[in-house]
Amino acid sequence: MSKLFWAMLSFITRLPVPRRWSQGLDFEHYSRGIITFPLIGLLLGAISGLVFMVLQAWCGAPLAALFSVLVLALMTGEFHLDGLADTCDGVFSARSRDRMLEIMRDSRLGTHGGLALIFVVLAKILVLSELALRGEPILASLAAACAVSRGTAALLMYRHRYAREEGLGNVFIGKIDGRQTCVTLGLAAIFAAVLLLGMHGVAAMVVTMVAIFILGQLLKRTLGGQTGDTLGAAIELGELVFLLALL
């Protein structure tokens, strides 16, 4: 289990992980790592929250929020933000399904993707600033948001098909079963409840689950399935929805 955790941490983040800690794990077994997603999110959110706490006393909530969001993006290699931008460029192009998928593969940033990035990043900064002004525990809120967003991403993997012929998203999409999905969501719910002292965190998670489930169905109808980009988009939007639900 520990080897699986380190493999997933290396796979979906840019945090340094010694190679020997995950050696011997076959790539085809990576789908089992979905149950570690909430724990990895918890770690990422806690680090981002610590950045906020350290900087808030020095430069105030808005700048602390700016740098905490920046650190969170850097720790993930901006993969999720890139997925959000690519998904929006493709889906909002109003082209055929195949053309949408081609646009999503294009490394160039389009208008829709750029607007989505600006909106999500600014929204996170503003919501974190508002939560701080209301006296909410930012470290716990960020840790829970990152855990829940990565946990609810399982809703885009279970009983979904991969929309492309090949790609990294194919490691998880359509490869996890109901038990793994329930365990992943259960862990995310436990983290949210413990960190935010009960039903407040669970209620925010329920809102996030509903939003991500609807997003998954819309993307399935539009693209014919999911991709690594749509998983990244779901994680970014899941973080934002969870934080908004805490207001």
Curated annotation (Swiss-Prot):
GO biological process, one term: cobalamin biosynthetic process
Signal peptide start-end: none
Transmembrane portions of the chain: 34-54, 57-77, 113-133, 138-158, 194-214
Chief subcellular location: membrane
GO molecular function, one term: cobalamin 5'-phosphate synthase activity
InterPro entries from the UniProt entry: CobS (IPR003805)
Top-rank lineage group of the source organism: Bacteria
Pfam families to which the protein is assigned, alphabetical: CobS
Bilayer topology: Multi-pass membrane protein
GO terms under cellular component: plasma membrane
Keyword Protein biosynthesis carried by entry: no
Alphabetically ordered keywords of this record: Cell inner membrane, Cell membrane, Cobalamin biosynthesis, Magnesium, Membrane, Transferase, Transmembrane, Transmembrane helix
EC number(s) recorded for this UniProt protein: 2.7.8.26
Pathway named in the protein's UniProt entry: Cofactor biosynthesis; adenosylcobalamin biosynthesis; adenosylcobalamin from cob(II)yrinate a,c-diamide: step 7/7
Compartments it resides in: Cell inner membrane
EC class (word): transferase
Transmembrane recorded as keyword: yes
Cofactor(s) the record lists: Mg(2+)
Catalyzed reaction equations: alpha-ribazole + adenosylcob(III)inamide-GDP = adenosylcob(III)alamin + GMP + H(+); alpha-ribazole 5'-phosphate + adenosylcob(III)inamide-GDP = adenosylcob(III)alamin 5'-phosphate + GMP + H(+)
Similarity-based family: Belongs to the CobS family.
Cited PANTHER family: ADENOSYLCOBINAMIDE-GDP RIBAZOLETRANSFERASE
Family matches, as HAMAP family: CobS
Role this protein plays: Joins adenosylcobinamide-GDP and alpha-ribazole to generate adenosylcobalamin (Ado-cobalamin). Also synthesizes adenosylcobalamin 5'-phosphate from adenosylcobinamide-GDP and alpha-ribazole 5'-phosphate.
Record's protein name: Adenosylcobinamide-GDP ribazoletransferase
Taxonomic placement: Bacteria, Pseudomonadati, Pseudomonadota, Gammaproteobacteria, Enterobacterales
Gene that this polypeptide is encoded by: cobS
